[in-house]
């Protein structure tokens, strides 16, 4: 990974898992890393751990709840008020397959509302800081959006994006991850059309052995069973540190391309420490559907850009 001194990098969901390991690696390379966390206590624990593992690094904790558009707006306003550049935005945070349908503070299904709408709003509101970075640096700013191999089974149900008619935990998750990937691709197209130097890149971690696996809202019994399964199949899955590699590649590699999608190159893209171009399902390349999704995101969030 290239040296990152002087770059300000914001990572959502950075208090644990892939987000934490990405923050750790970037901090060790000299970046100024902002850990965006919903829970202050968990964020402070993560920040203390990071300072222990990487002393004398430049990190800060910011409170941001992607399941609340008012929280997103408040954070973005505070950040823009500091008049400082943002060189890399990593849209990492995610909710995975809660067994019962839940809603965000704004009434959206929690996976679509957090994974797609929250990051859409955050990206749009922080665009001035990314453009400021472009004006002050010779390097192009980057927006990295985390998708998933689960997008391959995803379908955008525009008649029921909020899963109010029928809720399936995994179908809602797959839809949200397809939405993330389509957002990243559509964002790239719009940035290019606007002749913007900002890059939009997607990545996925493979299947990490803590890939929201035990952190989702399941009963103690379900978590116990999932824990046993996770231990049994660890050999086939990525660690969180390995899972962070595609994110780091997208955020820092000189040959990462805007509009690209990167993931591990091991069996079925499930694991591996080699990163390369990831497989894209045909539905993720549907430009008409992506444009429609963009309009829906604008309408639901009230955030309009590009």
Task: Label the predicted regions.
Residues 106, 110, 167-171, 231-234, ...:
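Short coil/turn segments at secondary-structure junctions
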Residues 35, 64, 235, 282-285:
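Pocket-edge positions in alpha/beta enzyme catalytic cores
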Residues 1-222, 299-306:
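Rossmann-fold NAD(P)H-dependent dehydrogenase/reductase core
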Residues 176, 227-278, 285-291, 295:
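C-terminal helical subdomain
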